[in-house]
């Protein structure tokens, strides 16, 4: 089973880098490390999580799931004010410095943008907008006033991976409607399904059949028979709570963080599938991977099909598609994020140059 959230991805990748061998899967029994390697692993995990992971933590974890559970508490900590996470603060001596605003991916937090931040100019401020409930439009309606409070009339640099890209796009529309200066919008593999996702009762049944197979593989549990009639009476929130409660009742020990990740992942992906995309009169950059990962396609087969414009061409007046290769799940980490960072740095430098020229005039 591959990593399921940011903590498991960081832990999995760190194990592979330090030992030179893939752990295989998150449930695979980890080989015993010597003390030097365990210390090196602990140091690297501590740097990524920004919290104290010890060699003892590494040596006593039987698999990646167990080690990631220790990493998660630190990785998801940090400075948060309401729903805004400070990834790098704007320098006090330069309040005019234009920050990058990033938006959380489906089922995750904005800590996933650390590798991107490390690929941008060293003094680039970055603020992450964390999860609020509701449709895409309802979430953007909460984010836009906060963006204006932080950045006034602009310019605005907005970016996001996965759902984060859809949220960045919705906020760009909200800001433009209020006459604000949106300088740049970047979608990191926020690629729409290549075919329409039907919203019918029959589709609800098919979706939950697929989810049951996905959950059995991901959690290593047996899902009891799904009571479709009961599910059909519930909204998306009620449906996922119902199914996850059944998973919990199975008696298998699953970290609370993973259960919450599954709940928010499901709701966030449903928000994408049911969003009504509005036209945008401006420039948007889409960093496009080759494909979605197998789990995403297993859950919604229509994501196996990708349009050359990622499904955005009919809405965006000036769309730039930048191919980055790889799978969706890899797009936010090294080495692929280096391509995004290099292109984005160029775009940021051009914006700063234009701004300096205008101020000079």
Which functions belong to the PLM regions below?
Residues 1-4, 63-68:
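Flexible lysine-rich "adenylation lid" loop at the C-terminal edge of ANL adenylation domains
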Residues 3, 30-31, 105, 160:
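A generic structural signal for short
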Residues 36, 40, 44, 65-72, ...:
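A hydrolase-biased, glycine/serine/histidine/acidic-enriched motif that marks catalytic-domain neighborhoods
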